[in-house]
Amino acid sequence: MDWERILCCAHRRCGWRRKAIFITNKHVLEGNDTIVLRLNRKENKGVSEIDAHLKSGVDNLYFVHPDNDVDIAVLPLRGDFITKEELDYSAFDIDNNAMDSASLRDAGVDEGALVHMLGFPMGLVNSSSTLPICRLGCVARLSDAQIAETKNILVDIQNFPGNSGSPIVTRPEIISISGTKSLSRSMLLGIVHSYIPYHETLRNTQTNEIVEVRSENSGIAMVHPVELIREVVDLFVKRYQG
């Protein structure tokens, strides 16, 4: 299993101390006992590959959302190991560098707002690369009804295998139409977990029978919003505070 699907994130909630965690999609971790994390070392000293265990006996060491339709998982990391190995742990603070969907709308982020996707799509990045590919897209739908029904924000962006768990961040805007709001800093909007497929049906002209169904990437990515990420992180916090 490849680290490149995993979003690195920091956490500080409810007055609790900062804790290092990985946030990714549930489907990335399911069915595996371990994953390999590739993390940069400080001062450009190369890359470390680290085995991370996902199970203790039959129990998972990671946390998932109680709603089966939410494809989010949180894996705690050992902060002392990160310090000892001198790893460059650049991360999103889930409280201070992220905004839930309601806060985004209040800040002026809506349909058409530009966003970036950061990730390592398989086959598109050289294996020795330490920097992600950045792709530009825009918010396609950010409505309350959309999120309540599907648990997703829709983003017009091309995501590929290997982008599961990729962060979507807002693009800072310093110019806005008079009387409207604009968000002047990059904030985590959510994480990608899949895309809406486009199906094309081929029929035999003589029998009118379906002979083939092709599935293509429609270019609309499904993104779980920050509020759902925080709900999973809070499960982890309650476990270790209790």
Feature names for model-found ranges:
Residues M1-D2, T34-P161, G165, T170-E173, ...:
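Serine endopeptidase catalytic core focused on the charge-relay Asp
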Residues C8-A10, L142, R171, S194:
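Residue-level recognition of beta-strand microenvironments
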Residues R239-G242:
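C-terminal recognition in membrane/secretory proteostasis and scaffolding
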Residues T24:
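Cytochrome P450 catalytic-core helices
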Residues M1-I21:
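A conserved glycine-rich beta-strand in the N-terminal activation segment of trypsin-fold
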Residues V213, V237:
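Terminal helix/beta-alpha structural elements that buttress the NAD(P)+-binding lobe
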Residues H11-R17, E173-S182:
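Alpha-helix termini
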Residues L183-N208, R214-A221:
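Conserved catalytic cores of soluble enzyme domains
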